[in-house]
Amino acid sequence: MTTEPRSNSQLLATIEVSGTHSQQVYNQVVNDLLRHTQVPGFRKGKAPRQLVLQQLGRERLRYLAMEKLIEDAVKTAVEKNNIPYLGNLELAGGITELLDQFHPGENFSFSVTFDVEPEVTVTAYKGLTIEYNPVTYNPATVEKLLQQHQRQHATLIPVEDRPAQWGDDVTLKLLTKDENGEVVKELSADELPLSLDEDQPFLLQEIPAAVVGMAIGEAKTVTVSVAEEAEAPRQLTAEIELLGIKVPELPPLDDAFAAEHSEFSTMAELRAYLEQNHQERAKHQDKQAKEAALIDTLIAQNPVELPKTLIRKEADVKVRTTLMQIQSQGVDLHKIMTEELYERMRQEAEPAATKEVHSRLLLKAIARQEGIEPTPEAVEERLNRYKEMLGNKTAKNLEQLRKLAHDEVQQEQTLSWLLEQNTFQPVQSDVATAEPTATAEAPTEIQTEAVAQTPSQPQKRSGKKASSAPSQE
């Protein structure tokens, strides 16, 4: 076998097979077919040889024999020469031309291309100055979170003697129509509860400002826009009628509030916990921001020819993960999934998959160059986590899971080592701030509500829910 490197981590291999071996493979294919081919009037495997050969056709036999010969020869050559074969095997030249050259009992030569693991040597990875967007703890974060929960537990008092204003909770009748005057049911509701909060975006973003100043029973028509992916925003018409106004009466943020809505007995204890929690969150997010900037820098300064096989495999993993998440929400994938949809999802996942493969190869190479190797205890600890998550499913693929645990721990340790070897410099006037989101360690009720109250689905404290209403985003 002779080999020649090609682009994108491919190898062109030319393999020659002896006439003796080509005849052996041909005979093997014929004998297998004789044993398994059913000929009318004969039991399987008992039909005369010539009759079976006549029924199958000699061209088909030669093709099947050539196909097996190529497959076996490539596998043997790869193993014998210790080639890091990945896949994506393609014949060099046309099938018809190659079949014309194949004659059992004669020497046979063919060429194939296939993906191999790239040889990666990283040169620029230490002593770099890397700009990133830092995440810093903002003391106002905790106060904002507490105010959100204070608002959630407010008592809503109906008012009738004034128009709606910012901070009110209102109930609307909403009728949204498209450009043709057709009702958009998904964006219409007989009774829609809405908080008039300037910091809480609404899907139809023009509605809250239009409601401010309206009196109960008043109606108006507003032009609204809805953004659509890859298209210009749709211009719709919204007919709104104000049905009711309620003003929130906020409970005091005192010890009683803390005791009722958290695991702590005093507000001071709750504040102290939340401050520590969000300081740790900001620190963790800042580290993640550094890691992301580091990866981008490594990729930019250390190009690697990536094999399509690895990119496709990683893209498939991302698509399957997305589909599992969709399925976990109760969606029947059999009703929506098609080959065309899967292929489109895979293509959309390829850019992220390419970056993931590139970064993983670089980190693995750096670990090899610097001798970063996780201890057996660290690998075993990570493996035990997988076992707990997967339960009885681990027995069949234990070694595969062990390798995954090793690679994951090694990558984390390599990233930590790289953070110490490089200097990180904040991008000027572009500083991110940790937002008041809850963590698993938050006090029980505070945690639950903070998780539930996302920008897309705010919790309501009173009022009726519409059967089909647009959500706040």
From Swiss-Prot:
Cellular component GO terms, alphabetical: cytoplasm
Biased composition (Polar residues): 451-460
Entry remark concerning the domains of this protein: Consists of 3 domains; the N-terminus binds the ribosome, the middle domain has PPIase activity, while the C-terminus has intrinsic chaperone activity on its own.
Protein origin, superkingdom: Bacteria
Name of the molecule in the record: Trigger factor
Pfam families referenced in this protein's UniProt entry, alphabetically: Trigger_C, Trigger_N
Role of this protein: Involved in protein export. Acts as a chaperone by maintaining the newly synthesized protein in an open conformation. Functions as a peptidyl-prolyl cis-trans isomerase.
Compositional bias annotation for Low complexity: 432-450
Annotated HAMAP family: Trigger_factor_Tig (MF_00303)
Protein family membership: Belongs to the FKBP-type PPIase family. Tig subfamily.
